[in-house]
Amino acid sequence: MSGGWDESKYVDNGEDEVVRQVSEPSVEEPIEASVTRYRSDEEKLDDKSSGAHVTEKEAEFDIEGGSRETSQWKHFLNVAVAGVALMSDGYCSNSIGTVITILRKLYPEETTHNKSLQDIGMIAYVGTIVGQLSFGWYSDRFGRKNGMITATIILIVSTALCTGAYGYKGSINGMLSALIAYRFFLGIGIGAEYPCGSVAASESSNELKSGLRHAAFIVVTDGAIDFGFVVGALVPYILVCIFGEHHLRIVWRLSIGLGLVIPCVLLPFRIAMKDPKTYVKHKVPLTKIPWLLVLKMYGFRLFILCLIWFVYDLSAFAFGLYSSTIVDGVLPADASTARSFGWNVLINTFYLPGALLGGVFSDLLGPKYCLITGLVLQSIFGFFMSGFYNQLVHKIAGFCVIYGIFLTLGEFGPGGNIGLLASKTSPTAIRGVYYGIAAAIGKCGAIAGVYAFGGDQVRNYFYAASAMAIFVAVLALLFVPKLKQTCIEDEDKRFIQACIDAGYGNPYNYEKNEPEQLEEPDRPPAFNPFLSATFSFHHIILC
């Protein structure tokens, strides 16, 4: 009797969970056997809810009474709605590189000896860091859904302001300054997407079938960023073909303004969605978390992930931002703007297969070894480009293909897997803060790359990027943990047990491997006017 799975003890409550029927142990059954039965049934209930054990009947219908295939698509839609807004990051990062090229051609006198264009490319990263750090706390405190809605609204407003940037009395320098200011707030919205959208996507992917969870996360986050990169290169090219070389002012404004499409489409879906079940189940007030224990358990792991993300973004975002400039340096001096943008589009399409293949192999090899494989292969192609750069620059087609493969391997390895590792190597209670810190340090690397790779020493840049890829691969091999399909549940259980062993108790308000105990209902607290006023104040603020 003890240790077996008994379907009669579980009933469908019509909602999202299976509820275990409470039954008293029989007279013949000793209390020790009852506890053992409870533990075994509870473990199998966890396995059942996570999809680890699926009966033939459950293979056709899920616990909500619908098709299991339909349920999987519903869960994937939740993952997509949470993560796909990162397309704005890729679009804004890449389209602004093309916009900078246009502004340099339109206003050579105002931009030749002025750092405004470089600041336009950099300032969004500063705002992104602010958004990542602040909304990391916000998403853990107020919920993933609230954070995503706020981030979407910020993206819509700031993108509209960037599109209509205008200087006082038509001043070009004033327009550039306004563009810098607006892109800072755009960066905050983009940064908010990381600890809100990406974290929600990782938690929602936990509801998918085992074997698809890593791929789903990478496709809707890194794949979305890469698709944004491609669209960010394609849109200016199409606009130049439509309006011509003599109407570049409308080209750069529309290139920015079309970035409104993504957040506007996503906003109603995000309003309708719910917080991931994992977050709802394991939400803990930040004041109740034993931060010293968290630092001891996750401090070094977070440091390694931050270092890897920093080094990767140091080259990755710089190459993305300056890809059109790099192509300009390879093309003849009399090449048209449309031709330059066209080759830039071709190069950026190589991002997409890297993200898709990276998602597939992340489930097959595991995120750790997929990351290492991509880094090693990328370094090989980088050293090749450095050694044969003088020959490649005279053959634009060959240069673009080799350069594109270099970018593909970057997305295959660290591009998708570093975000996956950051979102699934911490407990749910601190996942937003943990992920936000790692992503913010990565963006610091992107800022450093904007300045370090902003010159014309392209050959040396490939040398440096390849050497850094080898360094990151060694770090990952030595210190990055292996992740299983059940890594989110495993990390929560590990954190619970560590809190109990350290004497802090269970932060999630249930004891591992302990039977349920009947407790007397708590008496209602006495009326406290101060607490009542405080609650009313917080209620007004939140509303």
Curated annotation (Swiss-Prot):
Main location: membrane
Pfam families recorded: Sugar_tr
Cytoplasmic topological domain residue ranges: 1-82, 138-146, 193-222, 275-301, 362-368, 417-432, 482-543
Extracellular topological segments: 104-116, 168-171, 244-253, 323-340, 390-395, 454-460
InterPro entries assigned: MFS_dom, MFS_sugar_transport-like, MFS_trans_sf
Entry GO MF terms: glycerophosphodiester transmembrane transporter activity
Keywords, ordered alphabetically: Membrane, Transmembrane, Transmembrane helix, Transport
Stretches the record annotates as Disordered: 1-63
Location in or out of the cell: Membrane
One GO-annotated biological process of the protein: glycerophosphodiester transmembrane transport
Bilayer-crossing regions: 83-103, 117-137, 147-167, 172-192, 223-243, 254-274, 302-322, 341-361, 369-389, 396-416, 433-453, 461-481
Membrane topology: Multi-pass membrane protein
Single GO cellular component term: plasma membrane
SUPFAM superfamilies: MFS general substrate transporter
Biased composition (Basic and acidic residues): 1-12, 38-60
Family: Belongs to the major facilitator superfamily. Sugar transporter (TC 2.A.1.1) family.
PANTHER family (alphabetical): CARBOXYLIC ACID TRANSPORTER PROTEIN HOMOLOG
Name of the protein in its database record: Probable metabolite transport protein C1271.09
